[in-house]
Amino acid sequence: MKNPVETAMNLVPMVVEQTNRGERAYDIFSRLLKERIIFITGPVEDGMATLVCAQLLFLEAENPKKEIALYINSPGGVVTSGMAIYDTMQFIQPPVSTLCIGQAASMGSLLLCAGHKDMRFATPNARVMVHQPSGGFQGQASDIERHAQDIIKLKRRLNEIYVKHTGQDYDTIERTLDRDHFMTADEAQAFGLVDRVISEREAIEAPRTS
């Protein structure tokens, strides 16, 4: 069965613009990239993470001070892929705003809260879910033990990131992430995952271009 996200991407509309050299066609996402808008849509995995990181670095090279906007609608995915995006967001110079449309679950929620302070948003009907990392291992007992130790270290590191960006204490984060924890947009704001719930564009301050 085909991945519905891949199927949808094959149906991306084209935008035609008039230039001094005649007409030029862009796919809609390339056109939005010109406006410094990046989409994180669907499962977070290495291929998607590579594209998102490349777009972030490209936009930094174009203008190291102008805001970049990340639109997130993701169920989460591979932790290391998400951490690649997270680290790139923190590494580059431009402030990165985040906006949850639809859902931001698992690694999606971590990327949502990792936006620049006061520039993290969710739409009214967005859903957010946080939880601890999960994984399955097989092999020799000593290898399984090492994998278990590693995922415990990873859990601790993810908790520390949520502490940093939400303002919650470590015990609260650990308790909240112990199981799948679902939040409405307003609950996500109260928890510190987003700064504001917005229903119209005017509610977002003008992009920072200084």
From Swiss-Prot:
Cleaves peptides in various proteins in a process that requires ATP hydrolysis. Has a chymotrypsin-like activity. Plays a major role in the degradation of misfolded proteins. It catalyses: Hydrolysis of proteins to small peptides in the presence of ATP and magnesium. alpha-casein is the usual test substrate. In the absence of ATP, only oligopeptides shorter than five residues are hydrolyzed (such as succinyl-Leu-Tyr-|-NHMec, and Leu-Tyr-Leu-|-Tyr-Trp, in which cleavage of the -Tyr-|-Leu- and -Tyr-|-Trp bonds also occurs). GO terms for molecular function: ATP-dependent peptidase activity; ATPase binding; serine-type endopeptidase activity. The gene is clpP1. SUPFAM superfamilies: ClpP/crotonase. It comes from Chelativorans sp. (strain BNC1). The keyword Nucleotide-binding does not apply. Pfam families: CLP_protease (PF00574). The active site is at residues 106, 131. Fourteen ClpP subunits assemble into 2 heptameric rings which stack back to back to give a disk-like structure with a central cavity, resembling the structure of eukaryotic proteasomes. This is ATP-dependent Clp protease proteolytic subunit 1.
